Structures are given as structure tokens and as C-alpha cells.
Curated annotation (Swiss-Prot):
Pfam family, one: Ribonuc_L-PSP
Catalytic activities: (Z)-3-aminoacrylate + H2O + H(+) = 3-oxopropanoate + NH4(+)
GO molecular function list: deaminase activity
Function summary: Involved in pyrimidine catabolism. Catalyzes the deamination of 3-aminoacrylate to malonic semialdehyde, a reaction that can also occur spontaneously. RutC may facilitate the reaction and modulate the metabolic fitness, rather than catalyzing essential functions.
Alphabetical list of PROSITE patterns matching this protein: UPF0076
Family: Belongs to the RutC family.
Keyword terms, alphabetized: Hydrolase
HAMAP family listed in its UniProt record: RutC
The EC number(s) this enzyme carries: 3.5.-.-
GO cellular component: cytosol
Keyword Hydrolase: yes
Species assigned in the record: Cronobacter turicensis (strain DSM 18703 / CCUG 55852 / LMG 23827 / z3032)
The protein's name: 3-aminoacrylate deaminase RutC
């Protein structure tokens, strides 16, 4: 099955050469997602909970556009700028994954815009019937 580019309706234009998601063989690969509005400005500066919620809602939109749900998520790569925000980020993260949690890792690093506190990249296995 050839890969499909996944661009949800109303998605912002990426600030680099990538797409929000790619579907291949029933797997959705969601690009690193930052707390950006449609004009690529950081939303909710200084608020790790609101930024995390925005990021996960954006990821959900990509996965749903591909035909999946957040229950299909199998792996998340989480990048945070400060460990002091770890508990707040996890609080919101747990709301999006209330049952069995996907595998993940979390590292502290700098992000492309200094006001961004969190970035998440995701893999979801939606199966052969999924697709945009």
C-alpha cells in the first residue's frame, strides 16, 4: 500500500518541509507537533497544561483524519523544555490516554520556538481498514 499524506482540514502550513502525518500500511506517523496556531505562533505561552492539551488535540485531529482514534496510539515521543513541567504535562497526557497507555519516552531539550514548552510525535496503528 503506498503511503498517504495526512493533512487535516484547517491545518496550519508547516514551518519546515514536512506534513502533519503519513499513513502507510495501517500505521499513522504524526510529525512532531508543537503548540502552534494556524499562523504558526505559539499558543498559551508559559502554560504547560494548555500547550499539552493543544498539542494532543492537534494529534487527535491528524489521527482521526486518517481514520483512527487515540486508542490506536502505540508510541509517543515527548520533548519538554523543563522538567518542572513534567507533572503538569503528564496530568493532561493521562486525560487523552485513560485506559492502556501507549509506550513513550520523554526528554528535556530546546524546541524550535523558545515559548513552546512541549512537542509530541506519535505513532498509531489503525489497521488496514483505516485511511483518509
Amino acid at each position: 500500500m503506498p503511503k498517504q499524506v495526512i493533512i487535516p482540514p484547517g491545518a496550519s502550513t508547516p514551518i519546515a518541509p514536512f506534513v502533519p502525518g503519513t499513513l502507510a500500511d495501517g500505521v499513522v506517523y504524526v510529525s512532531g507537533t508543537l503548540p502552534f496556531d494556524k499562523a504558526n505562533n505559539v499558543v498559551y505561552p508559559g502554560d504547560p497544561k494548555a500547550q499539552t492539551r493543544h498539542v494532543l488535540e492537534t494529534i487527535r485531529h491528524v489521527i482521526e483524519t486518517a481514520g483512527g482514534t487515540m486508542e490506536d496510539v502505540t508510541f509517543n515521543s515527548i520533548f519538554i523544555t523543563d522538567w518542572k513541567n513534567y507533572a503538569a504535562i503528564n496530568e493532561i497526557y493521562a486525560e487523552f490516554f485513560p485506559g492502556d497507555k501507549p509506550a513513550r519516552f520523554c526528554i528535556q531539550c530546546g524546541l524550535v520556538k523558545p515559548e513552546a514548552l512541549v512537542e509530541i510525535a506519535t505513532v498509531a496503528h489503525i489497521g488496514p481498514s483505516g485511511g483518509a
